[in-house]
Amino acid sequence: MPAKGRYFLNEGEEGPDQDALYEKYQLTSQHGPLLLTLLLVAATACVALIIIAFSQGDPSRHQAILGMAFLVLAVFAALSVLMYVECLLRRWLRALALLTWACLVALGYVLVFDAWTKAACAWEQVPFFLFIVFVVYTLLPFSMRGAVAVGAVSTASHLLVLGSLMGGFTTPSVRVGLQLLANAVIFLCGNLTGAFHKHQMQDASRDLFTYTVKCIQIRRKLRIEKRQQENLLLSVLPAHISMGMKLAIIERLKEHGDRRCMPDNNFHSLYVKRHQNVSILYADIVGFTQLASDCSPKELVVVLNELFGKFDQIAKANECMRIKILGDCYYCVSGLPVSLPTHARNCVKMGLDMCQAIKQVREATGVDINMRVGIHSGNVLCGVIGLRKWQYDVWSHDVSLANRMEAAGVPGRVHITEATLKHLDKAYEVEDGHGQQRDPYLKEMNIRTYLVIDPRSQQPPPPSQHLPRPKGDAALKMRASVRMTRYLESWGAARPFAHLNHRESVSSGETHVPNGRRPKSVPQRHRRTPDRSMSPKGRSEDDSYDDEMLSAIEGLSSTRPCCSKSDDFYTFGSIFLEKGFEREYRLAPIPRARHDFACASLIFVCILLVHVLLMPRTAALGVSFGLVACVLGLVLGLCFATKFSRCCPARGTLCTISERVETQPLLRLTLAVLTIGSLLTVAIINLPLMPFQVPELPVGNETGLLAASSKTRALCEPLPYYTCSCVLGFIACSVFLRMSLEPKVVLLTVALVAYLVLFNLSPCWQWDCCGQGLGNLTKPNGTTSGTPSCSWKDLKTMTNFYLVLFYITLLTLSRQIDYYCRLDCLWKKKFKKEHEEFETMENVNRLLLENVLPAHVAAHFIGDKLNEDWYHQSYDCVCVMFASVPDFKVFYTECDVNKEGLECLRLLNEIIADFDELLLKPKFSGVEKIKTIGSTYMAAAGLSVASGHENQELERQHAHIGVMVEFSIALMSKLDGINRHSFNSFRLRVGINHGPVIAGVIGARKPQYDIWGNTVNVASRMESTGELGKIQVTEETCTILQGLGYSCECRGLINVKGKGELRTYFVCTDTAKFQGLGLN
């Protein structure tokens, strides 16, 4: 899998950055907007109080109220301005919250004490202090502990003040005690519902923040994955080929999921283009075979990577593109993908630089190696064929001729054809190359060749800047491979997949070293990617991520849809722009929805207690509350039936309905409307049923007057608690946080209209028992006073004020909660969508990487831990196979009919792709494709063993050989099928050998997995010296195959280049299909 970086907010990773980000999130998304909402609502309340004061006549009688109201307005106006200064708001947020609370409490107590001596009542400003308690939890930016503390102080202070004042002016009575107890129940209900509301909001806020961060992280990972994907693909393929292949992979993944199989098309996609006027360079290291035999696995990988890394640097400097590495052979092309008029000069210059580099190595280390270079100019077909292990390659007769030029070249010289010479424009001096004398093909085709004279050879050599050549005892004690490795490490070639190892970006983040050299005092094995904080690119990554997070957090503000246009919501953020998403949101399940019903039931209990304590105990009261209790009991039974079923194993329809409360929106909405409607109704239903028979006042009889006053007061005292009950009914609507805004608005509006109508048309107001009339009745002389009582004790006015105040507060709060819920749903959807895209990118990266490296090798370069060491592995027993289609060289022609060879390559692509499809079969899961070389297919078995298990038992080692034979037979069968459909008569020539090999990854610009060793060379010779339609093996391999039940036919002694005479055998393919039983 692609590297999983340590991102800004990892799970379980805490830090000041995370705390600051969460603080910014809370400030922007909740604390700021909610506090601003409270300030606006409270300011509106102050304005309403000022209007009420002026409407009562002489304002001088209400100086305390007016003074406090104007003072609070001024404070709130200043706070509203400070809300837009983020630095001050963040620093003084808690202080501002305390100041706001203190202003509200002070205003409340001014209302309590204003004209207190005129009429003392236990219900003084209970609704207003209930408002303070509720907003402490819902609108003020306190923590849960802080809110509980402030709410408790608000509650206790009111109870203590009212209790002491009531005892100071009147004789303590049971009636006053019951009223104070009812006040305590009301405040307790406000605190509990407020705490429930805050807990729900904190959970929702934390979830929204988590999903927001995850979504941003996924976006960031997605960008990194895309960059890694591009770099990974570009490390194997040129840009003009990679884009089409990448799109094809993504399309395949979308259509077929994660299945690693291609669609069943009649033809496989061909990514090949024709280019004219290019130069092809082949270079072979003479003497490297002897050097490799002396190298340890790591030394071999280091030497190859440093040499070819140096060649890659030379290629880049000379505008050449490396095509492929074949053992110790390196070939590249100039003029791809963009045509260059200097392509021939580029290749010649590169060839001379390569010879010079090898000369420096030879002089510095004393190792007898040299470079043989062949160049030809012409036309090529370039691209990728097959399905697995993509490698950019070139094909044409001109490519084959360039290969011949290298084979017929002279060590240390650049061998060119006449076609290349014509493109040099006399930039270099040349001499006759006599290539026809060294290669029969050149002689047959009458190709005249030349050797380029290096201009540097005619200049005096500069003072040596390289390591001194070891002499004497030092040379005897140090192996050639060691001298070679130590010297080449000073070149500092980049390691394979260095661009994938950086945990945050595709850049390796390494400090640039001039001339590609690394200081010798810093051993390469200890180099590590610098910390991201030290890298300018890392800092820019941090900055961009911070900006993205801050931008996302700004979008979470509940004031944003009101102030600016949103891409996701209509104005005021109550409806999604996308209709399908709106429906999905409304149908989405709501976890823990049953807890809302439990909280609403608690409010019902509190309303019931208030009525039982203070209201006349009539039959209507019992019936109404009994019916609502039955309704709520049924609702709770439906909601918590699954909880109760744990005690009772029987599960029936009730449990089924209970499980659907959180998942079925219609059922949930029905139950919520029924619950809220019941509470709103039962809070007021008994008011019109109260017996309001006002007694007649006796004239001139003070005792009768006081008795009538007492009876009237007894009738009027429940009225303020009906107001409180109605307010608690309003609050019950707000505990259903995830309920849609529209039903809440409808319920609150209908309830408000009904309450205002019932209160204002109630017969209790005909005596004005709680306003001016009560003040008059309390006069000790029995006469009525002309001075009106304080308007803050006028229940009719204040009831309307409190109901409208709570209506506005709950309406704005519900709108913000609805917006939060929609944001939560929106970010979850975005997270899900982007997570799917991220998984697609991961799968694409995996497929790409597995098309470059075997899966067990890919794990070395990617993962949670950085691994910058060389990858190299030695194996004791690996079976290597070369399978070629020699007839394809004859079949391949370049003419107008086959589009200059393109159609011939299309057939080769079908052959290689069909071969690749066999690798998907479980039977051949142990077979690893290494590469294709023209029409030759190279594979190996036994490379996937885990590290430390290379020396496994012989039986399992030998099983790989049988698998490879079966794979070779399957290749022959596939080729027969292609012959039947294409009307050709291609035959496969296969060579197999087994033995020790060294595997490794070399090349930084184009990392390539390869295997080396005598086993590989002999397997290649087995193929090149074999016969069509047969599998040739060595004598050692034959012995093992016979032990597995295969029949082999002795071919005899044959001459193998570099090995002398070897006895070889042909595997009897007719019987192999039936006798390969030892594999199981």
UniProtKB/Swiss-Prot annotation:
The keyword Glycoprotein applies. This is Adenylate cyclase type 7. Mg(2+) 1 binds at D284, D328. Keywords: ATP-binding, cAMP biosynthesis, Glycoprotein, Lyase, Magnesium, Manganese, Membrane, Metal-binding, Nucleotide-binding, Repeat, Transmembrane, Transmembrane helix. SMART domains: CYCc (SM00044). One of its GO terms (cellular component) is plasma membrane. Catalyzes the formation of cAMP in response to activation of G protein-coupled receptors. Functions in signaling cascades activated namely by thrombin and sphingosine 1-phosphate and mediates regulation of cAMP synthesis through synergistic action of the stimulatory G alpha protein with GNA13. Also, during inflammation, mediates zymosan-induced increase intracellular cAMP, leading to protein kinase A pathway activation in order to modulate innate immune responses through heterotrimeric G proteins G(12/13). It is found in: Membrane. Residues 477-482 are annotated as: Mediates regulation of adenylate cyclase activity by C5 alpha-induced G- beta and gamma pathway. It holds the Pfam family AC_N. Its main location: membrane. One of its GO terms (biological process) is intracellular signal transduction. The gene is ADCY7. It catalyses: ATP = 3',5'-cyclic AMP + diphosphate. Residues 515-529 have a biased composition (Basic residues).
